[in-house]
């Protein structure tokens, strides 16, 4: 850059970005990056898995089986985005992106086993750094006193940062194959 331009930028503490890319391509890349980094963000408890290209956020009370369901999905060839805590960012009016805090990226915690490094155990193709939130599956203990939609006629939604995401409540009973249920829902 011009030496005077550089001097004034330093003098006024203005960041100066340089790249060998064409200015239009570089500007577009910076705008995309800023759009994600400055987007409204919340933390959500659950597991985010990419199932057949759809971002499935599995939620429910602690100990209900979210991580176990995710592990079975990974074993079936799907991809882990994040376990336990998701950082959800609203990057556009209709798009939510989920990612893991750096400290938990690519790890799953299994009660009684400990922490598993999914990337090391299953390979690089078993993980993703970010993923869209397309569907929420809420796991809950089955209750004989509650009526459950057996035909899928009732539409449920969950609201995150003003975005309505399709949702399914799945009652948990011994012997249910949660991975298969998640695949079917996706």
What spans do the regions from the language model cover?
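P-loop NTPase nucleotide-binding/switch module
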Residues: 33-53
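Conserved NTP phosphate-binding and transfer environment spanning the P-loop NTPase/kinase superfamily
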Residues: 130, 134-186
